[in-house]
From Swiss-Prot:
It comes from the Eukaryota. It holds the Pfam family Aldedh. Belongs to the aldehyde dehydrogenase family. This is Aldehyde dehydrogenase. NAD(+) binds at residues 223-228. It comes from Didymella fabae (Leaf and pod spot disease fungus). Gene3D superfamilies: Aldehyde Dehydrogenase, Chain A, domain 1, Aldehyde Dehydrogenase, Chain A, domain 2.
């Protein structure tokens, strides 16, 4: 990737009309102009990736592991650079980018590098034959990324992919592509050419070309439900496997016997960490009617203290939305909430620095008097907005949670362990939390159900998504292999 402001990378189009701007969301200033790829340059990338795959799949597991550990070391050398770049193009807090996003890259490369030779195989002895089940790589794969966690998604897709012997082409989120591109450049100082590549793009052109390419054998996307469905439709034409992580409308449920202070703390983090631009954001608070007023009083006071601002500055709690369009989307939902009859019970503070007057800021917002049928309680807003609804019983809470289109997470706060465990089994989500909302999921399955998608990331089962099973069978020599009776009659053993 060029260090100049105008970035033309290896697989950029020759067409200058493919240029697109990347902004600093804290100031609105253009920080880079990137030349997107197109179907032609995507094909070139696929051809390079396919050639690399034919050699990479033969690299011994121990060597593959060594290279992945080396990748982790190289990324760590650039940790501060990556964190600052991430905040500059995405808007998240520098401390969060450093502690969470960038650290995850090295962690996930070491994790999957250490698992390469530990994926359990299967051996079946049926008496007359031995059957061994092993895993084979798909080939060239595609990884389509969103804008909210560029390092996490770049590593979360590329690490298990190449660990299993595949090669991958990354399509970064167009709103914040620079960090993903830089990470791939760093990885390529270690890996053979073509193992991990990126093709930038705007809109559906590059993802469609990637998904429909006959040499691309598997695609994983993290993004909107609309984008995910488009990938599934294109992949189905070639009967191509996909992995989908498409968002959530997650609930944090508080019962009367809960520790209200703990619940309020976790609800504050769940709603406003990463400025609410997280598929795991707990944007729906379900508060039992008996404690609703007490909880809201405590929670609203904290929301009012939240300071929106530049993620590079100390004292900032909530960064800007990633783009002006995302800001307008969130503000539209705030207007919709008021029109639907909900009440803005609390809002955080907007920045007053002149440098940030053109930034994409939205005041952190808490809605009360929310009915479960309202759009703000049903749709994924993807911004610093949280709704607080009342419920009266466990059954009602379960019904509200399961009424959402998505099913990613649910957090339950109660002193009654039996109730909490029972609810965990009843809610239609992929991940549940009892009296905590700690979302570092490396090592356990990350993913959901319903319109959240399918497949699991960040765990040993992820390696199965990035590979396919193969059966190897041979006679055991211990007993005759069964055969069709007419064969014994027409071609008897000599």
């Amino acid at each position: 990737m060029s260090a100049s402001k105008h970035i033309i990378c290896e697989y950029s189009s020759e067409d200058p009309s493919k240029d697109f701007e990347v902004h600093n969301p804290a100031t609105g200033a253009v920080i880079a102009i990137v030349r997107a790829g197109d179907a032609t340059t995507l094909d070139k990338a696929v051809q390079v990736a396919h050639k690399a795959f034919l050699e990479w799949k033969k690299v011994p597991l121990t060597r593959r592991s060594q290279l992945m550990f080396k990748c982790a070391e190289e990324v760590e050398k650039h940790a501060e650079e990556l964190a600052e770049l991430l905040t500059t193009e995405n808007g998240k807090l520098l401390s969060d980018g450093r502690m969470v996003d960038v650290n995850f890259v090295s962690q996930v490369y070491r994790y999957f590098g250490s698992l390469i030779d530990k994926l359990p195989g299967e051996f079946h002895d049926s008496g007359s034959v031995y059957r061994y089940v092993t895993r084979e790589p798909h080939g060239v794969c595609g990884g389509i990324l969103p804008f909210n966690w560029p390092p996490i998604h770049t590593a979360g897709k590329s690490a298990p992919c190449i660990a299993m012997g595949n090669t991958i082409i990354i399509k970064p989120g167009e709103q914040a592509p620079l960090t993903s591109m830089r990470i791939v450049d760093i990885l390529n100082t270690v890996l053979p050419k073509g193992v991990v590549q990126y093709v930038p793009g705007v809109g559906p052109e590059v993802p469609q070309a990637l998904t429909a390419h006959p040499l691309v054998k598997m695609v994983s996307i993290t993004g909107s439900t609309t984008a995910g469905k488009a990938v599934v439709m294109a992949a189905s034409a070639l009967v191509k496997p996909t992995v989908l992580e498409l968002g959530g409308k997650n609930a944090l449920v508080v019962f009367p016997d809960a520790d209200l202070h703990r619940a309020a703390r976790d609800a504050l983090e769940g709603a406003f960490f990463n400025k609410g631009e997280a598929c795991t954001a707990t944007s729906r608070l379900l508060i039992h009617n008996d404690i609703y007023d007490a909880f809201i009083e405590k929670y609203a006071a904290a929301v009012c203290k939240l300071q929106a601002g530049n993620g590079l500055k100390k004292g900032t709690h909530v960064g800007p939305c990633v783009t002006q369009a995302q800001k307008e989307r969130v503000l539209d939902f705030i207007r919709i909430g008021e029109e639907e009859g909900a009440t803005i019970a609390a809002q955080g503070r907007l920045p007053d620095d002149a440098e940030e007057k053109d930034g994409f800021f939205v005041a952190p917002t808490l809605f009360t008097n929310v009915k479960h049928s309202m759009r703000i309680a049903q749709e994924e807003i993807f911004g610093p907005v949280v709704t607080a609804c009342k419920f009266d019983s466990e059954e009602e809470a379960v019904s509200i949670i399961n009424g959402a289109r998505w099913g990613l997470t649910c957090a339950i706060y109660s002193g009654n362990q039996e109730l909490a465990l029972r609810m965990c089994r009843q809610v239609d989500v992929g991940m549940t939390f009892i009296n905590n909302y700690f979302r570092n999921t490396l090592g356990i399955p990350f993913g959901g159900v319903k319109e959240t998608g399918y497949g699991r990331e960040h765990c040993i089962d992820t390696l199965k998504d990035w590979s396919t099973s193969k059966v190897i069978q041979m006679p055991s020599g211990l007993a005759p292999v069964p055969s069709w009776p007419p064969v014994n009659e027409l071609l008897p053993w000599q």
